[in-house]
Amino acid sequence: MWQGVFPAVTTKFTETDELDHAEMERCFGLQMDAGCDGIIVGGSLGEGPMLSPDEKLAVFKTAKAVSGGKPVLMTINEAGTREACGRAREAKAAGADGLMVVPSMVYHADRDEAVAGLRAVAEAG
């Protein structure tokens, strides 16, 4: 099980609204060098809900490249279970060390629906 500090990192963009991989490498690397035990990408702070699936994977791969072997977790924050399961499978295939799963903010499920959705995402990833 993981322990320690796992900051949810921001996603960096260029002035032309493209992912800024060089700046992310620098910032993610600084956090790892400062003693963080892992990082979380694609969360709300990291513009996750606004990124395309390809952009989310690109940010993850940038983080993984500078992680120094420390865990990199991908946030799953999709509107529906089908989309969330798809992102979880993609994260697993890309080498994610774990997932931070956020229940849908669009559909407010009851307890049983929420548990079923989270279980489906866990099984997919």
Kindly give the residue locations of the regions a language model identified.
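Active-site beta->alpha loop and helix N-cap motifs at the rims of alpha/beta catalytic domains
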Residues: 1-125
